């Protein structure tokens, strides 16, 4: 099988009822695009504002268990941390009576680490967008696709890969984007590696730069924030990396910048690599999944403590004042 898919056929989904479970960030966008592509879509959600929004936007909306009962294909588009409980209470009992069913996940996490184990009779697939819902809709309106990872954990029907590719087309990823053949385990590893390594390293480096510049060198908070990220330069660099490549985009910077970046990248590489190796092992052997499950069971004490520590830091307070001055929207205000 080719490792990349640039287009697919919607035929496996035609004549079937597709239940989108969760009408949040991904659910709303995927349901809307599939409906535009002529597929029969219903929505399953708890009775909250998203339930009412789905009704307002013209979908048939049901409680989650009823939506699964009425569906031939279900897309689970709810947060990882609540999915296990929702699956066990609302979905698993319904699946016991299904002879042929397709269960699609947008994340590999729960299946990869054994938190959810669908019946052997169920096609268990993954279509994992590499983009948030808002970004997907922006691209869709421009007639463009976006990247997704595809995986199959169980192929009860012999057609699981066909279903995965068809969903990728149905939700607008292809054509125009790219679907990469992957696995639940691979997606979970890559997703968590980003969240555990370069993202916190970047955030930590920015905070350290701010603290040292302001406290030890007398730099104004405004100047520090604008230099490190608030000006938008960091976002522009990220855009160029996505479009041109991480090293190719360096030609847009001065030679001084290029030299400083390259010399320090190789200088710190061994230290960073050891961090990444340790985190990858911790993820792959299931240790993080256990840590996160215990944190949830305890009521998120570490999470809330660290969130408060971050948002009450001097950098966060200075950022809030600067963004107000610049007329930017400040959330949680």
From Swiss-Prot:
Keyword Amino-acid biosynthesis set for record: yes
Disulfide linkage: none
Record keyword Magnesium present: no
Coiled-coil residue spans: none
Enzyme class: oxidoreductase
Keywords: Amino-acid biosynthesis, Branched-chain amino acid biosynthesis, NADP, Oxidoreductase
InterPro entries: 6-PGluconate_DH-like_C_sf (IPR008927), KARI (IPR013023), KARI_C (IPR000506), KARI_N (IPR013116), NAD(P)-bd_dom_sf (IPR036291)
EC annotation from Swiss-Prot or TrEMBL: 1.1.1.86
Domain KARI N-terminal Rossmann: 1-182
Catalytic activity entry: (2R)-2,3-dihydroxy-3-methylbutanoate + NADP(+) = (2S)-2-acetolactate + NADPH + H(+); (2R,3R)-2,3-dihydroxy-3-methylpentanoate + NADP(+) = (S)-2-ethyl-2-hydroxy-3-oxobutanoate + NADPH + H(+)
GO molecular function, one term: ketol-acid reductoisomerase activity
Family affiliation: Belongs to the ketol-acid reductoisomerase family.
Protein name per the record: Putative ketol-acid reductoisomerase 2
Source organism per UniProt: Saccharolobus solfataricus (strain ATCC 35092 / DSM 1617 / JCM 11322 / P2) (Sulfolobus solfataricus)
């Amino acid at each position: 099988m080719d490792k990349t898919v640039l287009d697919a056929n919607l035929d496996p989904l035609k004549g079937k009822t597709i239940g989108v479970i969760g009408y949040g960030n991904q659910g709303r966008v995927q349901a809307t695009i599939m409906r535009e592509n002529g597929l029969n879509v219903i929505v399953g959600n708890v009775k909250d504002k998203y339930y009412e929004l789905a009704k307002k936007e013209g979908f048939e909306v049901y409680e989650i268990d009823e939506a699964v009962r009425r569906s031939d294909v279900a897309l689970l588009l709810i947060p990882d941390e609540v999915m296990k409980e929702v699956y066990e209470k609302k979905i698993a009992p319904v699946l016991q009576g299904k002879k042929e069913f397709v269960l699609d996940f947008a994340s590999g996490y729960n299946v990869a680490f054994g938190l959810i184990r669908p019946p052997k009779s169920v096609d268990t697939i993954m279509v994992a967008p590499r983009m948030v819902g808002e970004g997907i809709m922006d691209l869709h309106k421009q007639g463009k696709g976006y990247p997704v990872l595809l995986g199959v954990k169980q192929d009860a029907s012999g057609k699981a890969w066909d279903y995965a590719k068809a969903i990728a087309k149905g939700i607008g990823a292809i054509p125009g984007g790219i679907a990469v053949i992957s696995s639940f385990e691979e997606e979970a590893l890559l997703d968590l590696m980003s969240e555990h390594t370069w993202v916190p390293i970047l955030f930590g480096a920015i905070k350290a730069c701010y603290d040292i510049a302001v406290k030890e060198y007398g730099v104004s908070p405004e100047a520090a924030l604008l230099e490190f990220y608030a000006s938008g330069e960091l976002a522009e660099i990220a855009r160029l990396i996505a479009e041109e490549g991480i090293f190719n985009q360096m030609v847009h910077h001065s030679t001084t910048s290029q030299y400083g970046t390259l010399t320090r990248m190789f200088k710190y590489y061994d230290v960073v690599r050891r961090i990444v190796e340790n985190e990858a092992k911790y993820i792959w052997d299931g240790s993080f999944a256990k840590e996160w499950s215990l944190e949830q069971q305890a009521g998120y004490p570490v999470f809330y403590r660290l969130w408060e520590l971050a948002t009450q830091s001097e950098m966060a307070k200075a950022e809030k004042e600067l963004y107000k001055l610049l007329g930017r929207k400040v959330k949680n205000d």
